[in-house]
Amino acid sequence: MTRTAKLTIIPPGKPLSGRAMPPGSKSITNRALLLAGLAKGTSRLTGALKSDDTRYMADALRAMGVSIDEPDDTTFVVTGSGRLQPPKAPLFLGNAGTATRFLTAAAALVDGTVVVDGDEHMRKRPIGPLVEAMRTLGIDVTAETGCPPVTVKGTGRFQADRIRIDGGLSSQYVSALLMMAAGGDRPFDIELVGEDIGALGYIDLTTAAMKAFGAKVEKTSPVTWRVEPTGYRAADFIVEPDASAATYLWAAEVLTGGAIDLGVPSDAFSQPDARAYDMIARFPQLPAEIDGSQMQDAVPTLAVLAAFNETPVRFVGIANLRVKECDRIRALSSGLNRIRPGLAREEGDDLIVKSDPALVGKRLPAEIDSFADHRIAMSFALAGLKIDGITILDPDCVGKTFPAYWRTLAALGVTYQDKD
């Protein structure tokens, strides 16, 4: 399939109104897929996301002996034997961070060798802290560059009963270890250490999903979890809509003064990015400082929205954005300054958006490099709702988590000019 090279958003000039359902949560779908694959029996996942990231996870599980059927666009029927099998070839996971981190840890439960690999972007994303944590359990795991590819020689047995890991690193490392732990041979504790504990909400998502599949996991302190070696049992599981995807629709609503029905109230989400709703609702009076540490995937949405705010906004607690699909702090600063020089700047790992409500209605031709990052592409599309001339490069990258994004905006009244 030919990819669209660029897409120019035509400002609608009117409020966006209608019904627009966000897709299923990527974070929850990939957790549920792995847990269902580790379980013995047949699980049915409904409301699931079908996207690049979840297909990489599903295909990897198939390569490890799990049967996965897809009877419709939002359902996975997963049948596992209770133990993953060694794949015959390396697992290729593109640039799917959740799949890569989760399967690296899960590979320790395989009786054999598993190589976890990805594309050129994933090969630049760090995984060393997870590798080091696994080694403390006696697991034979190597990642020569500190990034994928990772080779895991699993046995399903651990030589320690406690892991201490820096809580300021990616929460995906912690989630990966937690999900692995229930399939091990002994109870053990996972403790976060350090001054900055980030994205605890995503760890809560993980433990909730684990419990739904029969695991016994207990939070014994604000930063410690104890996991019993229960394994997992098959379950029917409903995936809630994606809160990160919802942020684009909430922002489109306030930017255009529209009324968009997402089909689910903002307080129905359990995902941490739903916290952004209260911020978005304050537009154009966003706070002077926004801590993005507990809603990291919502920061690009908020940063672009901040460009139209009445006063400047500083984003803090976002250092981990530098090691996402791209350096999102740099990408946001670069893109905003393409729209108007001086609109944003980096200060250490903070992002400062100076804000300029006068941007609304102007023609400011700007090609925005998405850096093949779905969240950069979707966020800067919001700028195109109010500024004439915004062009997104590599718009098809939204297929990573929200394949219908451009169609969803079109159904609300947005039009485009594309160029292959």
Swiss-Prot record:
GO molecular-function terms, A-Z: 3-phosphoshikimate 1-carboxyvinyltransferase activity
Catalytic activity: 3-phosphoshikimate + phosphoenolpyruvate = 5-O-(1-carboxyvinyl)-3-phosphoshikimate + phosphate
Transmembrane segments: none
Active site residues according to the UniProt entry: D297
Primary site of residence: cytoplasm
PROSITE patterns from the UniProt entry: EPSP_SYNTHASE_1
Binding site for 3-phosphoshikimate: K26, S27, R31, S170, S171, Q172, D297, N320, K324
Keywords from the named record: Amino-acid biosynthesis, Aromatic amino acid biosynthesis, Cytoplasm, Transferase
E.C. numbers: 2.5.1.19
SUPFAM superfamilies: EPT/RTPC-like
Statement: the UniProt record of this protein carries the keyword Cytoplasm: yes
Function: Catalyzes the transfer of the enolpyruvyl moiety of phosphoenolpyruvate (PEP) to the 5-hydroxyl of shikimate-3-phosphate (S3P) to produce enolpyruvyl shikimate-3-phosphate and inorganic phosphate.
Gene: aroA
Keyword DNA-binding among record annotations: no
A GO biological process held by the record: amino acid biosynthetic process
Cell compartment(s), UniProt: Cytoplasm
Protein family membership: Belongs to the EPSP synthase family.
Coiled coil: none
Pfam families given in the database record: EPSP_synthase (PF00275)
Name of the protein described by the UniProt record: 3-phosphoshikimate 1-carboxyvinyltransferase
Pathway info: Metabolic intermediate biosynthesis; chorismate biosynthesis; chorismate from D-erythrose 4-phosphate and phosphoenolpyruvate: step 6/7
Gene Ontology cellular-component annotations: cytoplasm
Binding locations of phosphoenolpyruvate: K26, G97, R125, Q172, R328, R375, K400
Known partners and oligomeric status: Monomer.
